[in-house]
Each structure stands twice: as C-alpha cells, then as structure tokens.
C-alpha cells in the first residue's frame, strides 16, 4: 500500500510539472505584432535525402509575412533528388539559394557539419535553422522574432506540432511530448542561468548571429549526434539565455514516416545516452516503467487475477486516471489525436525495445546508423 501511495505521489509531482510547463510556455502565434525594426534573418535548411519533404517546406518558408529574410538550403550529399527539387524551386524564388555540401570530414557528425557550412554563408544578423521535414505558418517568422527580440534570447527553440499519419507515429510521437513535458521543468530551465541540460530541438533553432559564433557555431558540437541538446548547453556555458517555447501554432512536422526511420531516430538518442552513462538510461526507464506503465498492469492484475483490497484498487485507479488525464491534456494542447492515450502502454514498450537495441549495438561496438551514415560511440563524447 505504501509503495502505491509513493508512486501516486510521484505521478502527481510529474502532473504538477506538466501543468507549470503548459502554463508558462510562451506561444508565438498569428496575434504577435510586427517588430518596429525587423532584423535580417537567414533561414538555413540542411537537407539530406529529403525529396519527399523539401518542396513543402520551402513553399511555406518563401511565403512568410516578414520583410527581411533569405533562405539557404544545403544539399548534404543526398542520394535522391533533393538538389534537383531545390534547384527548380529557386529559379522562381531569388530569396532561395542552393548550396552543395562538402564531403563529410573526419571528426564531424553529418548534421553539425551541414549546419556549419550554412552558417558560414548566412548574411543575416539572426540565424534560424529548420529541418527539411517542417512546415511553417505564414506568420511563423514574424511571431518567433517578436518573442526572441523581446526576450533577448541567445537561443530560441521549441516544440512544434507533431503530425501522425500512421499507427507507429500515433503510438510514439504523442507519448514523446507527454514524457518531455512531464519530466523537463521547462518553466524553470527557461529562466535559470545554471549550466543544466536544455530542451533545444534541432528542428527549430534561432540565434542572434553573434551568439551563435560566440560559442564557435556548430564546431562546438561537431561530434554530437544529438547536437541540438548540447548546443543549448554550450550557450548556457557562454552565459547566454536559452528559451524553449510552444511552436504548435506556427510550425508542424511529420517525423519518422516509417517504422524503420522511427527506430533509427530514437535509437540514436538512446545510443548517445548509453555512450555517456548506461546507468542513466537504465534509471530513466526504470522510473518510466514504474510510474507510467506498471499502474495499468497493476490495475488489471488487482481487479481480475490477484484480488486486492478496495483502498489499494482506488489508489492504483487514481494512478491510471492521472496518467490518462495528463496524456489527454498534452494531446489537446499540441493538437494530437485525442484517442492516443489508448496506445500509451505500447509507446513505453516500443521505446524500451529500441533502448535495448541501442544498448546491444553499443555493447557490440557496431555504432548506430542515421540517414545512410554510421556513427560510432566517439561521436557522442568530446
């Protein structure tokens, strides 16, 4: 009984953190006013094998209601028609420029090197990195620049709306935001000057140019597979201000459209954690299992198999209802499928399986694959 009360108490603390995050996260939107003086912004798009996404992304970026910006796209040695598509689009859009990436040098991970090349060619006093699988509202740039300038940030990143077009995405992607918003005290991290991990997300990273180069640009994170999180840490180390916002009203993305991409994408995250501390990954999943998954099993077992006292059932039922309410709130705020809470246990089971897969690859020393490139554990440690 005491154990179940402790689990419920932990769940309520997670719920409180979730509520504080949703309450205090800033939300750029159509209602944001224009800046009196609009700084010139370079929108930088690294693209590798993005023929299915790049045209939609550029169509949304070229129609921004912001007066001063350029769009640079770097084809990172794609094996598909990404470069051909961008070349066709730029003929009618002089603000769009296509760059061709250099071969990946020794000691660099792929995306950091692509971003570094883009930044070297950027002319803006602000630099915005966006992924090629993102789509943006016409007022995106106006609204995020208003927040970034007013808040005097060194790096602004955030949580876009995640579209789900298949069952694997419905199982995992809504669960991702549930975990992030429950675990990370974003409301606190946005205001502390301590050098703690940040919730920087590589799909959208906005810098003043001088702050980007102050830390050395992407060269500071050149060995990182999940370079976004580490870039936030570097900004904090340099005394800069990091801010994470809710981007769901100005940007959406459709990540990991196949099961294979989803496994690869999550595997690189877990691989990076394992390379730093296998014990940390084990601890995270132990907590996730006990707090977010086990209550469902306990309830079924207590009702149908091992008959438990009524007060025990009430406590475990409260655990399950708390999880469901938290899931529904997150799905509502980020416009996710509201029935996805029914798939909640499958989301945790999927991530545990991928974590075990990453652990096995790390133990065997075979590295982890991402977009046709193989990375070894040395790409996670400076």
Residue ranges and their predicted role:
Residues 58-105:
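Acidic donor-binding segment of Leloir-type glycosyltransferases
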Residues 81, 132-147:
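Acidic donor-binding/catalytic loop of UDP-sugar-dependent glycosyltransferases
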Residues 12, 18, 97-120, 143, ...:
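Long helical/loop segments within the catalytic core of UDP-sugar-dependent glycosyltransferases
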Residues 148, 152-180, 210-213, 218-280, ...:
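Catalytic donor/gating beta->alpha subdomain of glycosyltransferases that bind UDP-sugars
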Residues 35, 281-365:
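Membrane-embedded multi-pass helical conduit in multi-pass membrane proteins
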Residues 39-42, 70:
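Cell-envelope/extracellular polymer assembly enzymes that use nucleotide-activated donors
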Residues 24-31, 50-63:
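Short, well-formed alpha-helical segments that are part of the catalytic scaffolds
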Residues 1-37, 174, 186, 351:
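N-terminal membrane-anchoring/stem segments of glycan-assembly enzymes
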């Amino acid at each position: 009984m005491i154990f179940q009360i402790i689990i419920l108490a932990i769940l309520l603390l997670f719920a409180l953190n979730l509520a504080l995050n949703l309450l205090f996260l800033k939300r750029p939107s159509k209602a944001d006013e224009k800046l009196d003086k609009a700084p010139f912004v370079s929108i930088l798009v690294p693209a590798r094998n993005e023929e299915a996404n790049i045209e939609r992304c550029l169509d949304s970026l070229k129609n921004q209601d912001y007066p001063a910006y350029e769009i640079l796209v770097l084809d990172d040695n794609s094996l598909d028609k990404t470069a051909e598509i961008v070349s066709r689009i730029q003929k009618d859009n002089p603000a769009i420029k296509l760059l061709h990436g250099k071969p990946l040098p020794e000691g660099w991970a792929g995306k950091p090197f692509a971003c570094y090349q883009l930044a070297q060619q950027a002319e803006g006093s602000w630099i915005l990195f966006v992924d090629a699988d993102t789509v943006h509202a016409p007022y995106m740039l106006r609204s995020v620049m208003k927040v970034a300038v007013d808040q005097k940030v060194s790096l602004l990143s955030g949580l876009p709306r995640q579209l789900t077009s298949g069952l694997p995405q419905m199982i995992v992607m809504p669960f991702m935001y549930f975990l992030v918003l429950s675990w990370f005290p974003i409301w606190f991290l946005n205001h502390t000057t301590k050098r703690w991990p940040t919730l920087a997300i590589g799909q959208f990273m906005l810098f003043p140019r001088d702050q980007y180069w102050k830390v050395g640009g992407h060269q500071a994170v050149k060995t990182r597979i999940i370079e976004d999180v580490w870039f936030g840490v570097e900004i904090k180390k340099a005394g800069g201000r990091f801010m994470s916002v809710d981007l769901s009203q100005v940007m959406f993305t459709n990540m990991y459209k196949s099961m294979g991409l989803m496994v690869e994408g999550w595997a690189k995250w877990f691989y990076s954690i394992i390379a730093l501390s296998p014990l940390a990954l084990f601890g995270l999943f132990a907590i996730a299992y006990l707090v977010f998954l086990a209550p469902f099993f306990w309830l079924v077992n207590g009702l149908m198999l091992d008959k438990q006292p009524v007060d025990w059932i009430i406590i475990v039922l409260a655990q399950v209802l708390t999880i469901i309410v938290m899931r529904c709130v997150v799905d509502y705020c980020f416009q996710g499928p509201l029935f996805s809470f029914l798939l909640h246990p499958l989301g945790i089971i999927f991530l545990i399986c991928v974590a075990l897969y990453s652990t096995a690859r790390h133990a065997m020393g075979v590295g982890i694959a991402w977009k046709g490139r193989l990375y070894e554990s040395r790409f996670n440690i400076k």
